[in-house]
Amino acid sequence: MKKLIFLIIIIYPFSTHSLEKTKEEKVAKYIIQNIQKDYVTCYSFYKVGAEVFKKAKKNKEMIKSLEKSADITLKFNYDLGEVLNLKPKYMAQITKEEVEKFTKIAQNDFQSLAKKYGLMCKKLVENQKQRIDYWEEKGNEKIK
């Protein structure tokens, strides 16, 4: 968590309104954009997962844990969105659309969502550095 906040502080001067001059700055922006999208995805996964478990009257501790993870990912989604100069209204719309998409999938096959996003989202909440490293590697491959 501290590393993510440190990354945000370091990257802030390179937000979308700044000129991107170096590869490092471009990669840093790429990392923030993709991590922010990951947080939207994981918020949607946790939010929908909590609803699925509530409807199935599953373990209350599991529901509480999913809701807590949803809160964490939503906060970071908005924090990084601010760094990227995204408007709150735009972020709310994107988040709403992603939740709706996940809800439709979950109605037919929640297991596929859990399989695809469960581990990635768990790791994102518990250790953002791993995901930052992932996007840094991808950014270095993509940006020349």
Q: Residue spans of the language-model regions?
A:
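Sec-dependent N-terminal signal peptides
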Residues: 3-14
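Transition segments tied to proteolytic processing and entry into folded domains
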Residues: 29-30, 126
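Compact alpha-helical subdomains of small soluble proteins
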Residues: 65-144
